[in-house]
């Protein structure tokens, strides 16, 4: 059911990335998403970073309009929807790239792990979008940047390959090319990734978010490595009108 909620707080997290705290607290599993509607603009899926927290990157008309809103303004939401992370594993790697941090942050906060390490990658220092309190929820934070302007020069997958033996389970969200490499490193075992496809209805009716035999909104957005074997994941996605789009 569509509900009107107010924006209680908004702040800049990184370059072109904002956080929005909403008035309604939701019961959710880390990895689930909501559909957020701006009247006269569009409706889009957004992963939850917390019970009433979303993080958004400015990339088009919808996000441009969302960025104009301030505290006290209203948006409309429905959900949460989809399947979240399982929470399996004792010593885990939580991997996020760019704006893939919201569901990973939620898992870090609410997961029950003996040991967890966050591996986060951004293109530059300016684009690091980590919540300030992330270190409270994990045992170690490792940051990589493509250009070496902060942390380790390279990618989260480089760190995973180097420290693979430390983890019995891996969770990840971010660019699909990165996720595909993580699946390869893990040989599709003991790994879950949050997939992204163009999504319209959010409830498994329209079929626009098809991924092999699955619908991302209904069967995902979180999938196990085994589920993604022999699918197009990591090879191509589709445009809103269904055409194949190379990654």
Curated annotation (Swiss-Prot):
InterPro entries, sorted: Cyt_c3_hydrogenase_gsu, Dihydroorotate_DH_ele_sf, Dihydroorotate_DH_Fe-S-bd, Dihydroorotate_DHASE_ETsu, FAD-bd_FR_type, FNR_nucleotide-bd, OxRdtase_FAD/NAD-bd, PyrK_electron_transfer
An annotated Gene Ontology molecular function: metal ion binding
Binding site for [2Fe-2S] cluster: 201, 206, 209, 217
Cofactor: how and how many bound: Binds 1 [2Fe-2S] cluster per subunit.
The keyword Cytoplasm is annotated on this UniProt entry: no
Biological processes annotated in GO: 'de novo' UMP biosynthetic process
Annotated metabolic or biological route of this protein: Pyrimidine metabolism; UMP biosynthesis via de novo pathway; orotate from (S)-dihydroorotate (NAD(+) route): step 1/1
Gene3D superfamilies the record matches: Dihydroorotate dehydrogenase, electron transfer subunit, Nucleotide-binding domain of ferredoxin-NADP reductase (FNR) module, Translation factors
Domain of life: Archaea
UniProt KW keywords: 2Fe-2S, Electron transport, FAD, Flavoprotein, Iron, Iron-sulfur, Metal-binding, Pyrimidine biosynthesis, Transport
Cofactor(s) needed by this chain: [2Fe-2S] cluster; FAD
Residues covered by the FAD-binding FR-type domain: 1-87
Keyword Ion transport assigned: no
Reported function: Responsible for channeling the electrons from the oxidation of dihydroorotate from the FMN redox center in the PyrD type B subunit to the ultimate electron acceptor NAD(+).
Family stated for the protein in its record: Belongs to the PyrK family.
Assembly with partners or alone: Heterotetramer of 2 PyrK and 2 PyrD type B subunits.
NCBIfam families xrefs: PRK00054.1-1
Protein name per the record: Probable dihydroorotate dehydrogenase B (NAD(+)), electron transfer subunit
Source organism (scientific name): Pyrococcus furiosus (strain ATCC 43587 / DSM 3638 / JCM 8422 / Vc1)
Gene that specifies this protein: pyrK
């Amino acid at each position: 059911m569509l509900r009107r909620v107010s924006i209680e707080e908004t702040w800049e997290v990184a370059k072109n990335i904002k956080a929005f705290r909403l008035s309604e607290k939701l019961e959710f599993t880390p990895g689930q998403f909501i559909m957020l509607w701006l009247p006269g603009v569009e409706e889009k899926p957004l992963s939850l970073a917390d019970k009433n927290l979303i993080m958004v990157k400015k990339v088009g008309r919808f996000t441009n309009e969302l960025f104009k809103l301030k505290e006290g303004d209203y948006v409309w939401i429905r959900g949460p929807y989809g399947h979240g992370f399982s929470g399996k594993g004792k010593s885990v790697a939580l991997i996020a790239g760019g704006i893939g941090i919201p569901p990973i942050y939620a898992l870090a906060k609410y997961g029950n792990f003996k040991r967890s390490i966050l591996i986060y990658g951004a293109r530059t220092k300016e684009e690091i979008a980590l919540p300030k309190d992330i270190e409270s929820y994990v045992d170690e934070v490792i940051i990589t940047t493509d250009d070496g302007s902060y942390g380790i020069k390279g990618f989260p997958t480089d760190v995973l390959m180097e420290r693979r033996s430390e983890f019995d389970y891996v969770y990840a969200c971010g660019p699909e090319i990165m996720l595909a490499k993580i699946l390869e490193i893990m040989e599709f075992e003991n790994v879950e990734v949050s997939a992204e496809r163009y999504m319209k209805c959010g409830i498994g009716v329209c079929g626009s978010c098809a991924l092999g035999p699955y619908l991302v909104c209904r069967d995902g957005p979180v999938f196990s490595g085994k589920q993604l074997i022999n699918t197009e994941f990591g090879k191509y996605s589709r445009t809103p009108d269904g055409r194949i789009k190379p990654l």
